[in-house]
Amino acid sequence: MSQKRVFTFGNGKAEGNAQMREQLGGKGANLAEMNLIGVPVPPGFTITTDVCNEYYEVGQEKIMELLNDDVMAAVKHIETLMNSKFGDAQNPLLVSVRSGARASMPGMMDTILNLGLNDEVAEGMVRKTGNPHFVYDSYRRFVQMYGDVVLELKPANKTDIDPFEEIIEQVKAIRGVKLDKDLSVDELKELVVRFKKAIKERTGKDFPNDPIEQLWGAICAVFRSWMNERAILYRKMEGIPDEWGTAVSVMAMVFGNMGDTSATGVCFSRDAANGENLFNGEYLVNAQGEDVVAGIRTPQQITKIGSQRWAERAGISEEERKAKYPSMEEAMPEIYAELDAIQNKLEEHYRDMQDMEFTVQEGKLWFLQTRNGKRTGAAMVKIAIDLLHEGKIDEKTAIMRCEPQKLDELLHPVFDKKALAFAKVIAQGLPASPGAGCGQIVFHADDAQAWHNDGHKVVLVRIETSPEDLAGMSAAEGILTARGGMTSHAAVVARGMGKCCVSGVGSLNVDYKAKTVEIDGVVYKEGDYISINGTTGQVYAGEVPTKAAELSGDFKELMDLCDKYTKLQVRTNADTPHDAEVARAFGAKGIGLTRTEHMFFDDQKIIAMRQMILADTAEGREKALAKLLPYQKADFKGILKAMDGLPVNIRLLDPPLHEFVPHDEAGQQTMAKEMGVDLATIKRRVASLAENNPMLGHRGCRLGITFPEITAMQTRAILSAACELKKEGFDPKPEIMVPLIGILNELKQQKAIIQKVAAEVFAEYGIEVEFEIGTMIEIPRAALTADRIATEAEYFSFGTNDLTQMTFGYSRDDIASFLPAYLEKKILKVDPFQVLDQNGVGKLVKYAVEKGREVRPTLRCGICGEHGGEPSSVKFCAKIGLNYASCSPFRVPIARLAAAQAAVEE
């Protein structure tokens, strides 16, 4: 064979090591490494991840043929080290068969224990051990596991009857016992017989007695489990590629169920929930590993302090705890001391928090696994900073140890985990904006405001949202929509506000008129309580308690470390002074995008805006815009003041005018009354604004060109606000950005208006403020002609939301109708509106930066689409030499960490 497919380990030697995760998976690599550093590990061998991929290419029979010689030699290796023989009734060897991908996937794939048992081997083990209860307990567990995993008899869902559990419950009921461990030897033997009979009835085949046949069945079953439903789902959630495959580790069995000097357990070198430097875990005396995980019996704590904390929470007295639930530290002090020493050794070796599995067989401790432990966002930050302080890792390693996306958990309200265990999931959507939201259902933005003002917490439920819903979204605890993807209006705005949002819930049937929403046949009406989880996309019936996220000193220290190494600045997308203040507190170095359209939806502003839209002469429009000017100036003044001394990039009006007018008759009647005109006039004007494809229609700079008075008013408002602030002793740094430029002459025309108004404003105030004029690169043609546009633009800001839409030809708001199929069929690997397409859209960005800087070497370039907060996109921005990335306030820390990691990785 050209490639090595099987690697052995045992007795302090190993053919692999910790650096071979890609070949041996995390489990196999760490089993080898533990051998090499002197940790007691049962001998065994690992079949590589490449074989898993071969299995799916050539099939089971060919794989068995390819592996046969190596596997048989590896079994012989275990036999030699254990001084026993696989399948020999006189001196039997049993093995476990376990999965192990290169990334930890806890509980996602399958394991088989006690493999090698048959009737003859069982009797031989009884003679050898003198412990028939242990032997037949192991035997019935093996037959059940083999039936579940290899013969695929485990029910597909929880409502179906498990044939093995049904038999166990029948036997326990006849005997009158509650726990499996209380069954007699004869009853355990009866279970084995009945299990085998159930297998024959369901498969038409006898349970395999040949241990070699059992072994091949188990190995191939573990490979099959790589593609089981839960493993596929987990990989999607964690971004683990399907092509990685799983390794298979076969190890000599050691038994935690051989009596009161035997035990099994799971432990962590630090607290995985909060990061506290406290050794902790659970163990069970006289049990096998799955008993701890399955929760059939109440496990006991490993440390005394852990046991005392557990008892206090459970309301158990110290006397009762010591008598009934002693810690391992108290009940098995010598084993505990060895366990504690080894867990310290493993953390020192791996320089990270370890998640370990162990078994004690008749007083001897064996380690079955170690891996870097899964942890919460809070624990992740604390552990990284603590390890830095302890001198175990350096600053760069501390930065790289933290996952940017997990910082989300620290920034938004979260559901109480205990309460979630009892919550009823009623729908699943897209996790559009993280956090937890709970409140009474309302269907209209006005109602959301009114209910909020009356002291109610509300969840705004919409088919989809629009800019008109902004105030209602702001008042709501969370937003739930039937349509829209991860970058729909609801999602983008919610993230900007730090609001929880679940979008694209196809099972929602919203009836605005009746003020009801039907979900899978159940009708929920206005005022009913629901809870939404923007981190998972789940929707729950009723109120699920939440708790506020608290930021630690460790978090601040991590962010300071990031600033020490980063080269790419992080700005924020902010439309209000509050957003700006939040982002600045999170470390934003300015504003990369202020959307002026969101400022127009207050009551008085929208009336003036609609008067401008209704006007059919430039004079009429200027009169209406004069009413808007003081409002706009006040808005800009607040934002520039909040970001004092830092740049604020303000985008001139971008959306089409139809978004500012009502489309329902009641709203149009109200508008007619406010405007002092008849309903027919309003209807005609609204109809005239309708466009077949508004995304590519009369919007952006096209509005400023057809209605130059809009550009003039907004420029006047921005620069007047800046002049007033400068006179008050502040240091405003405005940037005026012209949107949707595709042709150089568009920018020239708008720039002329801006410069003319600037001269007028500075003359009025008798003071000048430095400002820059730039453009948004969001049309492919603008990117391709960047060298020409840079002759007029002082900076580029890449609007990657629209650039992605126009490059792919996908509508951002409609992609949810086909994206799931594209992802499932692997046409797309990821949603291009969430993760920047580096091969297409990214190439346009890179090209535009290079061409622009050929003409203007000092050209500042940034990104202000939602990609600005996505870690891999931020790293790409750093790689191609952008000056900054801009994202919503609550994604600023994520982008700061990603930017620092990009610098460290260089």
Report each predicted region and the residues it spans.
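Nucleotide/phosphate-binding sheet-loop regions of phosphoryl- and nucleotidyl-transfer enzymes
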Residues: 1-423, 450, 456-459, 466-471, ...
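C-terminal accessory/binding modules appended to enzymatic or scaffolding proteins
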Residues: 13-21, 433-475, 841-858
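Short beta->alpha connector loops at strand-helix junctions that form conserved
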Residues: 45, 482-484, 503-506, 594, ...
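Long, charged amphipathic helices and adjacent flexible linkers at domain junctions
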Residues: 69, 237, 399-451, 457-458, ...
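Conserved alpha/beta-domain cores
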Residues: 98-99, 551, 561-906
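Short His-Asn-centered micro-motif
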Residues: 251, 461-463, 481-483, 572-573, ...
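Glycine-rich phosphate/ribose-binding loops and adjacent secondary-structure elements
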Residues: 364-366, 459, 466-474, 486-493, ...
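A short, small-residue-rich loop immediately preceding and capping a beta-strand
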Residues: 477-483, 501, 862
